[in-house]
Design a protein with these regions (language model features):
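Activation segment signature within eukaryotic-like protein kinase domains
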Residues: 139-140
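Structural motif at the C-terminus of the N-lobe alphaC helix and the adjacent alphaC-beta4 loop
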Residues: 82-91
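Conserved short submotifs of the Hanks-type protein kinase catalytic core
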Residues: 107-121
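Protein kinase glycine-rich loop
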Residues: 14-21, 25
């Protein structure tokens, strides 16, 4: 956490919002020019994801091959940010503001920081508020709007599920987590990705 804080001058880490197989998400805040607090979310992805993954890779390949494999993984993750850049500003897609790739000092690997707007996940929203008929219709309409934008930009999300849908404080539903999304021109329908149960 100290390394994370030192990499984010001007920002204060408020809390860890959640974690999963792809990394952790933190709430950050900083003072805006009017003295108020500005909040955002920071997705932190480490490559490799754990010491165990590092050790397993090192036991099966050369250091040169491992470095190339890890760089390839960093590039894949960075492509999520580039895809979101093409969709930036749309009201129904999570807005990503910034990305940093920071190499580990003492060993092989990188940390990727993706700063984005702070939102509530759909499952958390439903637990706290429930869903009216009107909000279900709005959810459907907002997701159709997000998917139409993806189609216009030749992007296939490939992992739409409640955990990848977010809600703004104004009740706007947004599609996020484009970690397995790809430009459709370079994929085939035979590629199997995403969450199996969805």
């Amino acid at each position: 956490m100290e390394n994370l804080q030192s990499s984010l001058p001007g920002w204060e880490i408020v809390r860890c919002i959640g974690s999963g197989s792809s990394g952790k998400v933190y709430e950050l805040k900083k003072k805006d020019e009017y003295g108020g607090d500005f909040h955002c979310a920071l997705k932190v992805i480490s490559v490799p994801g754990s010491q165990k993954e590092y050790d397993e890779m090192l036991s099966t390949m050369s250091e040169f091959a491992m470095r190339a494999k890890l760089r390839e993984k960093v590039e894949e993750i960075s492509s999520e940010y580039r895809l979101l850049g093409a969709l930036r500003g749309h009201p129904n897609v999570v807005n990503c503001e910034d990305q940093m790739i920071i190499p580990h000092e003492n060993d092989m690997g990188w940390d990727i920081y993706i700063r984005m707007e702070l939102l509530q996940s759909l499952p958390d929203y439903v637990r706290e508020n429930g869903m009216t008929v009107e909000s279900v219709i709005k959810l459907g309409s907002d997701m159709c709007s997000a998917l139409e934008l993806c189609r216009e930009n030749n992007i296939i999300h490939r992992d739409i599920k409640p955990q990848n849908i977010f809600v703004s404080r104004y009740g706007v539903f947004k599609l996020g987590d484009f970690g397995v999304a790809k430009a459709s021109a370079i994929r085939t329908s035979a590629d199997k990705v995403g969450t199996y149960s969805y």
